[in-house]
């Protein structure tokens, strides 16, 4: 009813569920505007940048190619106001976004896009430039002299694990297949038996089907 398009939805007992809803997002669609504003309000109302992460459901409604634009919206309240002025006439009746004057600093952006997610995931060698870090480094042009979105969309230099992969804004032809990053957080091992009981009562498959076997570890 929202879009008039066909949709697909499926559920397989309690193991999985998936769905496809084709959406054409439009500036003058109030529902779409509120969807967008909800995320922006969370970013701007949560005072501690360590408690919010810049992440999207790529490649669906929020491709990561939009990160530079999102960063500009967070760092520049004037640009945010100009964008809001083109939205649905009743936008301000349903959201507080227009009244929020906060602007993210470069440090805030580094936290929500790098340091915060790495810390939350327990990746001790990611998200910082200290001893033992993997030397994942991006070098940008000066934000004060350039459009924010353009700066973040086109880094001047990028180092991945200490190896340069972007030079003078150009991608070098030395990329390799990436690695799967894993972490091993501490937990109460007694919880496994409780989960196993639930599997036996409610699931059609065994909990052992969820374990990752050794043959998948070669790229970890």
Residue ranges with predicted function:
Residues 1-42, 48-64:
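Active-site core of metal-dependent hydrolases
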Residues 45-52, 62-220:
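Active-site microenvironment of metallo-dependent hydrolases
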